[in-house]
């Protein structure tokens, strides 16, 4: 029986009490406590002194030495980690509604309990199921929990906790305060959504929504077990450190076995100076309106929109590339930008993922189109394999359009590249091997062209550098100057040429060469050009505008024949390249230099090429538009065709060469020939035999002549010329110069046209007015085309002749032309240019223009809406060019040219006139005119022949958002 020791009375002396001797065990436990308390007091005192700056904080060594005295470590891993072997699946009932999920869950539960027992611990199942036989607890959270009895077993010193798919609902920090080993079977998603046979889940707002077939739906947050350690505070504020070990489960990629091992315990406040992140946090998977899940080891990222069950999986590197692309685009970002990068990254579902990902990139939502001058469509997007592609713009408008059907620029992208390859490379590809006689013609032509064989010597690279003196050429040469050799390789890289088209068409491609090849092969081509081609009277490149005019004058004395080839570059055959172009160069150079040229030539015509969008294609034998032999090769081939024509007319070789030398001017695929009987059918026959396509037009001695986009109205008197207005006016407002401001780009373009067409109505006036409206800006950052115009001014000595010829082309009177010209000169701003040309589209391919799909098809006559000024009062300009009602049969024929609506026969006007009945009906519709101020309104006119629509044309694109200073008023047809 325990002896009762009465407490001493307050009146009794303490000395009278028998002394109580502490046990040795208690003293041993008290000693470290006292030591720790003293050490803690010392640390707190030191902290106080640090605050008042009487001493310095502990350095890392001193702090670590103090912590080592009080730290408590566990060696749990050595016993438990070795039990974590592969998970073996146990069978479940065949009729289980979600057998797969149940199999993994049950197998994991059994496996974790066995691992705990094998390591010597007593398993403690948190939120235990009805199958668990070990110790544990069971509380009620959901209605389903009520089917199993309540349970709350005590935690012993030898407990090991087991969490089987329940840690989401548990207060894990409180359980970790027990400082016991933990095994968890939990959801660690690798993507934001998952679907399988019996269950699925998706993430939204940092919560997982889990659906089980034949079962319930759950939603919960996840704990973030990222990293290698987790720290929590114990009940006495001590620091509890757990290490994390994760084991992936084969067959269930979104589930893991996680081992939380108690590793170290440090009392308060010894760990206070350490930089320790304390607490277990919930997994964060939502940023704003986007759900994001990133796995840094595999660089996998999963994204979805808030509230969406559908995700996009890609790599972090790919997403970074897409984001950078969006940030640095000068034009509005497009879905195709994303799709293109995904395709290149190997995403087989790029077409589906691109639109979803595009909406998830924040940068894509804040970019807008910077073109402010007009809402008129400026680009067309060919229909192609990328259904969601929007393409990249290659230019923009600097003023409002002057035409009802403005010219269009091609978008850049996969669809445009495919259209280019199909329309400019594959479709016109020429495999024709002509008759034997053409082999003889080729030999004769080459011998006349290069009379002395083996005398040529290539330039050195220094001479090439002096000639190629523009900034881009210099940069290209400097880039390879140190590494170039005679054995350099080549690569074909094609890109879409930034040029405007009268309607949708297969974009032209420029096939660039490796800089090394361009430099080394130019040594040969410049030498050949200097010694051979410049000596030929028919060779047009390099001639000044005055020399071109004089040459045309000498040719046109008895009439001319103009030829217009179709897809000339793409239709050149291997036979033509080898028997004409290559043969001429090889004959010119010395024998020991021919091997090198042949090597460069073969590299130019390597057969595989790649577009800028990554489209691979077989390049065939068509002219490489970016090679050193492009212009010279095409001009020689053009000359060879003409030589064959004269041989077909039974001229001797010498006579054929003489006629070519005396009666032709050729530049690339442009040709003007002195006319003679039988020449036109001979041309058509030769072209057919060589596998080419051409349209020919015969002009009389006094007829206008068109060459390289310029019209020479009366060569019998003067060499005055002007730009073809039907080609030029629709594209005046467009520029491809993105390196300068819109105002500077407009000024550059205007200065170029002012140099070539200062006396041309509308065109020259537009240029002068733009320069005035831009504050007389000087040329800065001009394109190569603009620089060429500035340095090649054409003679315009007879302005009245230009007015008469241009009015005839446009189908209006000179007085009406002057009125249109005046309207342009009175434009109040760049975005208030008047519409002066009534043209229409003749689309050649299906494409998207202004959000609508257009393409070849019958023309439908429409009445365009009025475009009112900001004041609300429509201004009616004079009769719009191309809409005349007063052309009669006695009118002078319009000058030649290659624009739409031009006749292919000499002596006939090319602008169709309106039938008398239609003119009479239109004259009676005075109620449609509005205020005219004595000037006639602009009317849409019917084509010749009873007003029936022209097949193959479509109406002008009408855009109600276009800002103009004039109202286009149409009378009923």
Curated annotation (Swiss-Prot):
It is an enzyme of class 2 (transferase). It is found in: Host mitochondrion outer membrane. Its EC number is 2.7.7.48. Residues 96-264 are annotated as: Capping. SUPFAM superfamilies: DNA/RNA polymerases (SSF56672). CDD domains: ps-ssRNAv_Nodaviridae_RdRp. Its cofactor is Mn(2+). It holds the Pfam family RdRP_1. For RdRP activity. It catalyses: RNA(n) + a ribonucleoside 5'-triphosphate = RNA(n+1) + diphosphate. The keyword Transferase applies. GO terms for cellular component: host cell mitochondrial outer membrane; membrane. Residues 558-683 form the RdRp catalytic domain. The keyword Nucleus does not apply. Residues 853-973 are annotated as: Disordered. Its main location: host cell. Keywords: Host membrane, Host mitochondrion, Host mitochondrion outer membrane, Membrane, Nucleotide-binding, Nucleotidyltransferase, RNA-directed RNA polymerase, Transferase, Viral RNA replication. The active site is at 669 (for rdrp/tntase activity). Residues 882-891 have a biased composition (Basic and acidic residues). The viral bipartite genome is composed of RNA1 and RNA2. Homododecamer. Forms 2 stacked rings of 35-nm in diameter, arranged in a crown-like structure at the opening of virus-induced replication vesicles. Interacts with protein B2. The N-terminus is important for both membrane association and mitochondrial localization. It may also contain a RNA methyltransferase (MTase-GTase) capping domain. The C-terminus contains the RNA-dependent RNA polymerase domain and a structurally disordered region at the very end. RNA-dependent RNA polymerase, which replicates the viral genome composed of 2 RNA segments, RNA1 and RNA2. Does not need an exogenous primer. Also possesses a terminal nucleotidyl transferase (TNTase) activity. The TNTase catalyzes the addition of nucleotide to the 3'-end of plus- and minus-stranded RNAs, probably to repair the 3'-end nucleotide loss. Forms the open necked connection to the cytosol of the virus-induced replication vesicles. Mediates viral RNA1 recruitment. This is RNA-directed RNA polymerase. It comes from Pariacoto virus (PaV).
